[in-house]
């Protein structure tokens, strides 16, 4: 199966910076790799990163070893019987009215003011803000439509930007009301360009 380029870049980074160096340090070759070796890797990683990060490592390892079985480099996938950590439930924290107003005061006039305000008020992701186009803002009907993203990643040692007209999830494609303060701020920004 195929994955998005940004996902591939993330997998490559995990493999080349974390996973492979760990096993190379222990001088463990692919054909010698055991379930216990992988389990020990997860335990070691849990001392420095979250369970969710280790779950991502597991996905990379499992997929790579599944491919190694497919091309007959190894006979069985040692990651198949590893107990991966349980996913941690995300508990978001939010600014209260005073905190958000303090933030807005601090960023007044900063080059990232518009981006930070869009993130804080509308909950836009970084890649949604970077991918925002003037055509997504309907000043007549006062709407803001999220339908384009730009994601940055490193692939083969090169920094690249990936533009996409598909969102992270179906619910990410959305149209929201453009409130008066943001309408005025965005119109002023557009006039300066």
Regions found by a protein language model. Name each.
Residues 51, 55, 70, 74-75, ...:
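Basic, Lys/Arg- and aromatic-enriched nucleic-acid-binding interface segment
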Residues 1-73, 89:
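N-terminal core-binding DNA-recognition domain of tyrosine site-specific recombinases/integrases
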Residues 31-34, 96, 179:
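GHKL-family ATP-binding catalytic core of two-component histidine kinases
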Residues 64-67, 71, 106, 185, ...:
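Generic, well-ordered alpha-helical scaffold segments in large soluble proteins
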Residues 81, 132-192:
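Conserved tyrosine-mediated DNA breakage-rejoining catalytic core shared by Y-recombinases
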Residues 10, 40, 56, 81, ...:
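Short, solvent-exposed alpha-helical surface patches in well-structured domains
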Residues 19, 38, 61-64, 72, ...:
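Conserved hydrophobic/aromatic pocket- or pore-lining residues that grip, position, or stack substrates
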């Amino acid at each position: 199966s195929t994955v998005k380029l940004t996902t591939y870049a993330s997998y490559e980074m995990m493999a080349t910076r974390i996973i492979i160096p760990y096993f190379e340090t222990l001088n463990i070759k692919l054909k010698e790799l055991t379930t216990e070796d992988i389990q020990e890797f997860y335990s070691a990683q849990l001392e420095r990163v979250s369970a969710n990060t280790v779950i991502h490592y597991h996905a990379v390892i499992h997929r790579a070893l599944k491919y190694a079985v497919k091309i007959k480099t190894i006979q069985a996938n040692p990651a198949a019987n590893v107990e991966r950590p349980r996913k941690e439930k995300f508990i978001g924290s939010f600014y209260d009215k005073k905190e958000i107003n303090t933030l807005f005061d601090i960023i007044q006039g900063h080059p990232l003011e518009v981006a930070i305000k869009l993130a804080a008020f509308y909950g836009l992701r970084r890649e949604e803000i970077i991918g925002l186009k003037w055509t997504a803002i309907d000043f007549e009907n006062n709407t803001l439509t999220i339908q384009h993203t730009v994601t940055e990643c490193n692939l083969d040692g090169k920094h690249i930007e990936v533009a996409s007209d598909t969102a992270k999830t179906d619910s990410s494609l959305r149209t929201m009301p453009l409130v008066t303060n943001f309408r005025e701020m965005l119109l002023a920004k557009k006039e300066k360009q």
